[in-house]
């Protein structure tokens, strides 16, 4: 994301996102592993808290069809602009962006209609003064998106309607989300952990 005076643009081609894309770290990264990517399997994913769209773009660049849901009209407009410019950039950027479908609305309602295989949820967390969350872009994002007081309800809806798994992106040392069952397993990143909730009843998922 590039800053422009008092505003910003979502940028999937340049900056940190472009660097991450060009590095080609692939399916071995923590998020793709948590989402169920394997050598021969690419899941269909709903990013229920799209935000900056970075995670969705990473997953789309690895071949997944990703539906992004953003309830903030302002953030939705920034995401639409970012996807449009990635399409215009051509090549692998356009290929990844072509797999991204952007919806504006409340994930708690839309998930019931989509019945997704995999849901990724990254709630807005309280700011931590010694992390990148104090950066201007994150402050602006917080102003656009606000807090997520309904994050527990969103998790409950996701667990009720996902067909394979739900992935909760959570601060590494934070307590578990209250009121939600224990995750099936966790994938640990540098500063983040991914709590993975398998939706049992699918024999393939139970073997993963």
From Swiss-Prot:
Q: EC annotation?
A: 2.1.1.242
SUPFAM superfamilies per record: S-adenosyl-L-methionine-dependent methyltransferases (SSF53335)
User: Where does it localize?
Assistant: Cytoplasm
Q: Which domain of life is it from?
A: Bacteria
Q: What does this protein do?
A: Specifically methylates the guanosine in position 1516 of 16S rRNA.
Which family would the database say this protein is a member of? Belongs to the methyltransferase superfamily. RsmJ family.
Which protein is depicted? Answer: Ribosomal RNA small subunit methyltransferase J
Species per Swiss-Prot/TrEMBL record: Agrobacterium fabrum (strain C58 / ATCC 33970) (Agrobacterium tumefaciens (strain C58))
């Amino acid at each position: 994301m590039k800053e422009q005076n008092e505003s910003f643009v979502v940028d999937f081609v340049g900056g940190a996102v472009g660097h991450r894309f060009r590095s080609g770290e692939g399916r071995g990264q923590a998020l793709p592993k948590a989402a169920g990517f394997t050598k021969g399997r690419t899941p269909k994913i709903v990013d229920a808290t799209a935000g900056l769209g970075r995670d969705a773009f990473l997953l789309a660049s690895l071949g997944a069809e990703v539906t992004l849901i953003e309830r903030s009209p302002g953030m939705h407009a920034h995401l639409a602009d970012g996807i449009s410019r990635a399409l215009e950039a051509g090549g692998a950027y356009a290929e990844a962006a072509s797999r991204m479908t952007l919806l504006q609305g409340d994930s708690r309602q839309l998930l019931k209609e989509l019945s997704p295989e995999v849901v990724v949820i990254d709630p807005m967390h309280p700011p931590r003064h010694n992390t990148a969350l104090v950066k201007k872009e994150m402050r602006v994002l917080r102003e656009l998106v606000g807090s997520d007081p309904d994050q527990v309800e969103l998790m409950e809806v996701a667990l009720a309607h996902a067909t394979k798994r739900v992935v909760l992106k959570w601060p590494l040392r934070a307590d578990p989300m209250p009121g939600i069952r224990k995750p099936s397993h966790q994938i640990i990143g540098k500063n983040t952990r991914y709590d993975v909730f398998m939706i049992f009843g699918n024999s393939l998922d139970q073997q993963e």
